[in-house]
């Protein structure tokens, strides 16, 4: 897991510096992990997992729009998963 986090952090640093290929690789790498996390979160809450794709798209959009707020000296994964957690909770609140 540490290798994955280091890889994601490096890709995000490169993306922030303007490397669009690194940004594409990062999004491709995080998407299945986010999808699995969204499906798990929905299932634990007793919600249909078919909403996972919508949540993943919301997360990826938020990452794109907020990428300038990420501290490049910090690991990327905790920042990403904080966004994911917050958007999943928002989705669950809106469903109730």
Residue ranges and their predicted role:
Residues 4-10:
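Acidic, Ser/Thr- and Pro/Gly-rich low-complexity regulatory segments
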Residues 16-17, 40-46, 57-75, 94-96:
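Sigma70-family region 2
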Residues 34, 38, 42, 67, ...:
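Hydrophobic-face residues of short alpha-helical interaction/recognition segments
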Residues 11-15:
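Hydrophobic side-chain positions on well-ordered alpha-helices
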Residues 20-24, 28, 32, 36, ...:
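Generic detection of well-ordered alpha-helical segments
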Residues 51, 75-76:
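A conserved beta-strand->loop->alpha-helix hinge within the catalytic CA
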Residues 1-2, 17-25, 36-58:
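Short, charged helix-capping/linker segments at alpha-helix termini
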